Swiss-Prot record:
The gene is ackA. This is Acetate kinase. The record marks 179, 240 as: Transition state stabilizer. ATP binds at residues 15, 207-211, 282-284, 330-334. It comes from Exiguobacterium sibiricum (strain DSM 17290 / CCUG 55495 / CIP 109462 / JCM 13490 / 255-15). Pathway: Metabolic intermediate biosynthesis; acetyl-CoA biosynthesis; acetyl-CoA from acetate: step 1/2.
Amino acid sequence: MAKIMAVNAGSSSLKFQLLEMPNETMIAVGLVERVGKDDAIFTIKYGEGQKFTDVLPLATHKEAVELSLEKLMEFGIISSYDEIKGVGHRVLHGKEKYADSVIITEDVMQDIESYTELGPLHIPPNLIGIRAFQAILPNVPQVAVFDTAFHQTMPEENFLYSLPYEYYTEYGIRKYGFHGTSHKYVTERASELLGRPLQDLRLISCHLGSGASIAAVAGGESIDTTMGFTPLEGITMGTRSGSLDPALIPFLMEKTGKTAEDVLNVMNKESGIYGLSGLSSDLRDVQTAAKEGNHRSEMALRIFANRIHGYIGQYAAEMNGVDAIIFTAGVGENSDSIRERVLRGLEFMGVYWDPSLNNGARGEELFINYPHSPVKVIIIPTNEELMIARDTVRVGGLVEQNA
């Protein structure tokens, strides 16, 4: 048995889970919010429903890591730091070099740092989180688990943009895709639930949260995905526009007087469900307003669902069929009305979903198709932390995993 920490460091947050491997038991889950503020919030859940919350000043991620480890000791969750045998870190970008998770060395750190321009909001805190754990647990293997790695199996026809080829060779401009850890987890879990080898399956994974992406997974490998060079491409999201005509950028610069950076900021933070509805990026608020007759909210929901619906058709065509459609992440797992909007009309391709199973289904593994449906429809709550822990064990050679 080995205790593994799975870590996701954001710009002002630190999320972690402590898991016992290889039996994959979650021991504790923690969240530090508002890092860098005088009123940072620390929350930890452990044991049989125990929960502790504190508000205190935390100037740095290193202080947040120190506090997290101290509380694990204080509450008897661990008796010594030596019990932690590995730390896995979610890292946004690994470019083409990293098609799998790796032990973090100084060379790996330099590579990740050089990718900052591809993820200026995410990569700096990823690095800060790694450095903080390295400082406190210097002899513990640290593993980088890249959001982009799973999609490195995409063929050229799906990852290349129709730009001068030199832009790819010189600047690395191509589709990378994201949410790879989530897509990998749910497709592997779908194989188990279907009782069929992953190598024999054609799956469409819909990771629908505030950030959202869809992946076509054939034979266990990602062959296409909606997010691109950055997480801005693809379907409509909470605050992101998704794909649109790139000529809009200079047009909007001229019309509004904004810089290119300003326009990109609008597309990343003021668009999507929020921009369309004018109300909120939270689909629950928008759904409530739509039920009350708010046209823009209803329109935003239609656009969101229609983009997903269209990609399901596209990816089924790319794989010459589909065996199962998976819904995961906050919206995918919990919104029966969004699932209904997405699935409605897909009967032509063998998707026969059961409204009585879909209605009210929230956050649980569940088939929501009729038994005779050629294409299965499955809700699978994602578990990126477990995937990170599995990779940490595998790459670090820490314990024998369950067969």
